[in-house]
Curated annotation (Swiss-Prot):
Top-level class of the enzyme under EC nomenclature: transferase
GO biological process entries: DNA-templated transcription termination
Listed GO MF terms: RNA binding; uracil phosphoribosyltransferase activity
Motif (PRPP-binding): 93-105
Gene this protein is translated from: pyrR
Record bears the keyword Isomerase: no
Catalytic reaction equation(s): UMP + diphosphate = 5-phospho-alpha-D-ribose 1-diphosphate + uracil
Gene3D superfamilies associated with the record: 3.40.50.2020
Keywords: Glycosyltransferase, RNA-binding, Transcription, Transcription regulation, Transcription termination, Transferase
The family this protein is said to belong to: Belongs to the purine/pyrimidine phosphoribosyltransferase family. PyrR subfamily.
This protein's name: Bifunctional protein PyrR
Length: 173
């Protein structure tokens, strides 16, 4: 099994900053935006985007945490650890996750989101898009496009969970 670091901490920070600038450019009314991090690492990426938006625009956007597990079609989990302290009805919600792969986690997160309210618009920001979609889902904001084979794995590490920031590709062959 071979592991190769493809994004270091500096490159990750730049990708998050780029996503933040794109959010600013594409959203005319930032005061109507709610950030929704998809557990686990998407929550920490959402917090970083929230911090950058505060630094750049002086805005304190609300942030929520979506747990997609109870809404997945490939596992049964009863406990829902979603934390959404703001009413999302009529809001522009930006889902934030670490890796976009098949699209199934995003579908589950959207199901969770619409169970909480009716947002005006939902968009998606991901740190890494690796391709191989099984559902017709695409990201609106992408930090890095990293094409992979179906046997390779992308691992995103964030300092808040893993002690360091990096993205690695693992080749099991």
């Amino acid at each position: 099994m071979k592991t190769k670091e493809i994004v270091d901490d500096v490159t990750m920070k730049r990708a998050i900053t780029r996503i933040t600038y794109e959010i600013i450019e594409r959203n005319k009314q930032l005061d109507n935006v709610v950030l929704a991090g998809i557990k686990t690492r998407g929550v920490f990426l959402a917090r970083r985007i929230q911090e950058r938006l505060h630094q750049l625009e002086g805005l304190d956007l609300p942030i929520g945490e979506l747990d997609p597990k109870p809404f997945r079609d490939d596992m049964r989990v009863e406990e829902d650890t979603t934390l959404m302290s703001v009413d999302i009805t009529g809001k522009d919600v930006i889902l934030i996750d670490d890796v976009l792969y098949t699209g199934r986690t995003i579908r589950a997160a959207i199901d969770n989101l619409v169970s909480l309210g009716r947002p005006a618009r939902v968009s998606l920001a991901v740190l890494v898009d690796r391709g191989h979609r099984e559902l017709p889902i695409r990201a609106d904001y992408v930090g890095k496009n990293i094409p992979t084979s179906s046997v390779e794995e992308i691992v995103v590490e964030v300092v808040e969970v893993d002690g360091r920031d990096r993205v690695s590709i693992i080749d099991p062959t």
